[in-house]
Amino acid sequence: MAHKKGASSSRNGRDSAAQRLGVKRYGGQVVKAGEILVRQRGTKFHPGVNVGRGGDDTLFAKTAGAVEFGIKRGRKTVSIVGSTTA
């Protein structure tokens, strides 16, 4: 019986925390300005009307309204419709 664990076993045992990516607000949901709609790496979803894109490609609502997912020119887009600009 070996009294040492072996070369690799003591070097294992690390993992990174999940990044919590994905869609945060779904189609038809009413949102306020500034709410995060999608967290993503790269532009899986592109910003549509009244939606901004952050430095890490996060999509956020620029105005209040309802979330709408669509396709434009073969790209998935996220827009805010029925917004009340006050």
From Swiss-Prot:
One Gene Ontology cellular component annotation held by this UniProt entry: cytosolic large ribosomal subunit
Disordered: annotated span: 1-21
InterPro entries assigned: Ribosomal_bL27, Ribosomal_bL27_CS
Biological process (GO), any one: translation
Keyword Ribosomal protein recorded: yes
Entry GO MF terms: structural constituent of ribosome
Recorded family membership: Belongs to the bacterial ribosomal protein bL27 family.
Protein name: Large ribosomal subunit protein bL27
Organism: Mycobacterium tuberculosis (strain ATCC 25177 / H37Ra)
Organism lineage string: Bacteria, Bacillati, Actinomycetota, Actinomycetes, Mycobacteriales
Gene giving rise to this polypeptide: rpmA
